[in-house]
Amino acid sequence: MRVNTDAVLLGAWMEIPMQDNISMLDIGTGTGVIALMAAQRVSNKLSGVKIDAVEIDKDACKDAELNFSNAPWDGLHPNLYNTSIQDFTEWEPQKKYDLIFSNPPYFIDSLKNPNQAKSVARHSDTLSQGDLLLCVGKLLKPGGKFAVVLPKTEGEELLRKIDFLFNSAIGKQICVLSAKRVCKVKTTERKEPKRYLMEFEYNVATEREN
C-alpha cells in the first residue's frame, strides 16, 4: 500500500502534547506513516512515550511492521496490533491515551474496489463513524485529544454527530468529544475544500458561551 497525502497532512497538522510519558494510538495505521511521523516529532524531546497502532488488514500490517522495525528512533518503535479497533477496545479496556489519531475508511455508499486491501482501507463498513466515536470515547483519557482526517462530506457528517452528542450530554457530567480545531484543505485557492483535518477534546460537556 502506498503512502497517501491524507496521512501526511494529518501527521504534520495534529498537535502532540509535549510532555513525558504520553501515550498515543493510531487507529487504522495502514503502512504506519502517521505513527512514524508522531515518533519522529517527539524523538530526542520526550521520554517514556508509548505509541500503539491498530490495523485490521494483514498485508498492511506486514508493511507497517517492516517500517516500524526500520525506524531509527530507539525506544520509539510503535506497538502493532493486527485486529479491528472494536476488538482492541474490548480486549484492552484498561488502555487510555492522551492522543488518538486516525485516517479512517470513508466511502459510505459507493462501489467497492475489487482490490480487497484498498476496499478495507476505504470503505466504512469495516469501521463506521459511530463505532469509531464509541471506541475513541472508551480509549481517551479525560482531556485527551482525537485528531482525524476525512473528505469534506464525511467530515461535515462527523462534526454534526459530535455536536449532537455534545449538546445531548450537557448537564449530565459525562465526558464527550467537542471540536477544538478544524482545518479545511483545498487543492487550489478557488476550489471547494477536499479534506477536513479535525481535532476534538474529550471532556465533560458544559454550556458554550454565546
Language-model features: where?
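Conserved SAM-binding loop and adjacent beta-strand
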Residues: 1-16
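Conserved Class I SAM-dependent methyltransferase catalytic core
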Residues: 3, 126-193
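Conserved SAM/SAH cofactor-binding pocket of Class I
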Residues: 12-93, 99-102, 108-113
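Domain-wide signal for the mature, well-folded portions of proteins, strongly enriched
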Residues: 30, 87, 122-126, 131-135, ...
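Mobile active-site "lid"/loop adjacent to the S-adenosyl-L-methionine
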Residues: 104-131, 138
